[in-house]
Each structure stands twice: as C-alpha cells, then as structure tokens.
C-alpha cells in the first residue's frame, strides 16, 4: 500500500483528457503517455502477455500461483479524464485527518464544503486528496488505475492464492469509445470488474439505457419589419420543443432509478437551429416511450410549417442496461459482495446514473459490474478521493482474486 498514493499522484500529473468529435482513438496524445508508463510498470512488475494495441488498449496477465479449475478474471480502468473540465496541470492538495468544515481549494475563493457536499460529514479523520480549484482531480479513473496497479503489486509480492488475473487499461471512456476496440477474446477473462465507481462499498451492475437525440430546425428569416406571415423563427420552434419536454423529468430533478430528458446543447439563428438531447432510463419500456415522446413533440411542433421549413429528428441508441447480462451470472456479484464484507465494508448495490466501459463489455460477452474507487464529485473542481477509500478498493480487489481461487480449488 506504500506506493498507492505515490502512483495516484504520478498518474494525475499527466494530462489525459479525452476529446469528443475526434475520429482517432485514443483521442489525445496525453493518454498514450500514461498507457506507455503503465506498460513499463507492468513489465517491471513481471506480468506477462503485455500488449498495447494501436487503439490504446493495454492488457496484461498475472499468472495463477495455484493449481485447479480456477476461472480467469479481470479488472479494468480507463486512463482518460473528462473533457468537461480542465485536466491540465493538476495540483492535488492532501488534507490529512480531515476535521470537518470547509476545505480551501487553492488560494482563491473556492471551497469544498459539507454544506454542498454532505458526504464530507462521513469522512472525518480521513485523508482527503482534493483539487486546487482550477482543474478536476482525475480520480475518475486514475484512482482505479492506481488501485489495480497496487493490487497487482500486493498479489505479486505476497503468498496470496489466486488464479489468472487479467488487467486492462482503456482510453476514451469519457467520450464513449473506451470499449469499442476492446478484444474480449484476447483479454481471456471469464468475467471482469471495472474499477470506476464512487464511494466505498458501491457495487454497480445496473445502468441507464441511453440514447442521443439530434434535432435540426430549418426556419425562414426575413426582415422583422415585414415578417408577418412569412418569418419562421427556428429559435422559437426550438423553445416550443423544449417547452413540451416534461420539466420535472430532467437531471436536476431526478435521482435513483428515475429517468430523464436532458437538453445538452442548443445553438442557432432565426434561419436554422440545432438541439442535442440525451435520453436516459433504467426501464427498457420507459426508455422506448421517451424516444417516442420526442418524436411526437417534433411532429406536433412541426405541423403546418411551410414546405421549405422543417424539423428533422435523429435518435441513436448509445448503450443499454447491463443488468440483463450480469444477472445471468449471479456468482460475479456474490464474490464481490463477500469480498467487501470480508474487508469490513457494507456492500451498497446502487444503479449507475451513467455508463462505464463495463456496459459495452457486458454486451460483448464479458460480464462486468463496477467497483468503487473511493472518489466523489467527478468531472469538476470539487472532485476528491480519500486515501482510505483507495486502500479499501485495493483490499477488495485482492480479496476478490483470493475468493475466486478458493471457488475453483
């Protein structure tokens, strides 16, 4: 455990923000730097079958140290950080023995406050690693990367019985491309866990069904002084569309298993406008109903427009709820829960209000629930992680390996 914090601080010092709208994978050069560093560290650690694909997927194997019919398992984390907030020149602050109250982030006015983030009340006495208020931290998911690397070191350096352990580090998870080029067969695991969750105890195997909705609105612009009966204002049509979307079914008004419509961007002029929504729901039937609702709204608002003016709507499914794949293999969750209990952690089964690489991988034939990292408030300047939470994650990874070995002996 002595190198856990050192690894994490080294990894977050590298700018690995991914970039949307880029065809190449990985989308940024910084991700290659971390992947090459990890490859070197895996080689120094003595792992085998180390490969780094042209699409930036790094894989390696820790061979079994016991005999028996033990299934090969895997652990996966992503190296990129979110493009939503700066990940350049990350300057972490280490707050030892947190005593409560506000934590100043850097020298400005930014604070990490328990008023806004009540979870801090539960973390008294712990060591918190925060930002300086100018960048995100990168615990999502460099905490997971550091935890997997540290768990490998623990397994490698101690006589803990384990079967074959396969690890992978992926790029571009934050822009939805992380698992697209993942070779499940080459990975060689019967099942895996992404280490990409939040607070201690979280175990996630349910996620949103997700779709994107792109709306193009073509209007007609003329001089406002002579516009009566002629002008068709694309921006006004966009406003009418959004007014029809249920206001109480937005991200800021929903939680738990509740789905939502989210207007992610809107731009335009009188002549032309574009809107981008994302749709999310855990229930497949409700998910399909939300898509139909968007089509009905577009049809309603577009009714009776001049032939040269129109509303075009394109819906694309992004991913589905991995629950249907994971529940076919209940032992995967049983082992993870038992590992947590053995480490004096109460498992907290909760839905992912988002997605992970494990979602796509589960539908590619690799069941892959998500383990906690000990991090909070991802994708922004209030992101932080606890050292104790990271240590617990390492313990759980090691215990999962040990329990899987016992299962096969």
Curated annotation (Swiss-Prot):
The keyword Cytoplasm applies. It is found in: Cytoplasm. Binds 2 Zn(2+) ions per subunit. SUPFAM superfamilies: Bacterial exopeptidase dimerisation domain (SSF55031), Zn-dependent exopeptidases (SSF53187). PROSITE patterns: ARGE_DAPE_CPG2_1, ARGE_DAPE_CPG2_2. Cleaves the N-terminal amino acid of tripeptides. This is Peptidase T.
């Amino acid at each position: 455990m002595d190198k856990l914090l050192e690894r994490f601080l080294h990894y977050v010092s590298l700018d690995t923000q991914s970039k949307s709208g880029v065809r190449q994978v990985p989308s940024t050069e910084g991700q290659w730097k971390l992947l090459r560093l990890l490859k070197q560290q895996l080689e120094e650690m003595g792992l085998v079958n180390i490969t780094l694909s042209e699409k930036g997927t790094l894989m390696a194997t820790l061979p079994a140290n016991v005999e028996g019919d033990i299934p090969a398992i895997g652990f996966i984390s992503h190296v990129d950080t979110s493009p939503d907030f700066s990940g350049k020149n990350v300057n972490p602050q280490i707050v030892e023995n947190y005593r409560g109250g506000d934590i100043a982030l850097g020298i400005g006015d930014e604070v990490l406050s328990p008023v806004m983030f009540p979870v801090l009340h539960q973390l008294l006495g712990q060591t918190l690693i925060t930002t300086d208020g100018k960048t995100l931290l990168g615990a999502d998911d460099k905490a997971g990367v550091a935890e997997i690397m540290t768990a490998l070191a623990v397994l490698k350096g101690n006589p803990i019985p384990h079967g074959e352990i396969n690890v992978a580090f992926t790029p571009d998870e934050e822009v939805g491309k992380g698992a697209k080029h993942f070779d499940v067969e080459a990975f060689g695991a019967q099942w895996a866990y992404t280490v990409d969750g939040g607070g201690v105890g979280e175990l996630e195997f349910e996620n949103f069904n997700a779709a994107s909705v792109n709306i193009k609105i073509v209007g007609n612009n003329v001089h406002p002084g002579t516009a009566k009966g002629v002008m068709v204002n694309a921006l006004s049509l966009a406003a009418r569309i959004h007014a029809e979307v249920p206001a109480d079914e937005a991200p800021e008004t929903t939680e738990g298993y509740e789905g939502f419509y989210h207007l992610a961007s809107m731009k335009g002029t009188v002549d032309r406008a574009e809107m981008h929504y994302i749709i999310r729901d855990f229930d497949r039937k409700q998910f399909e109903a939300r898509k139909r609702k968007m089509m009905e709204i577009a049809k309603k608002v577009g009714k009776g427009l001049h032939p040269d003016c129109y509303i075009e709507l394109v819906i694309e499914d992004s991913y589905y709820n991995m629950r249907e794949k994971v529940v076919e293999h209940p032992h995967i969750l049983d082992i993870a829960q038992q590992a947590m209990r053995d480490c004096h952690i109460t498992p907290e089964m909760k839905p992912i209000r988002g997605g992970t690489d494990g979602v796509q991988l589960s539908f590619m034939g690799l069941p892959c629930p998500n383990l906690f990292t000990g991090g909070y408030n991802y994708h922004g300047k209030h992101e932080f992680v606890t050292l104790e939470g990271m240590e617990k994650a390492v313990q759980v990874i090691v215990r999962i390996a040990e329990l899987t070995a016992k299962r096969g002996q």
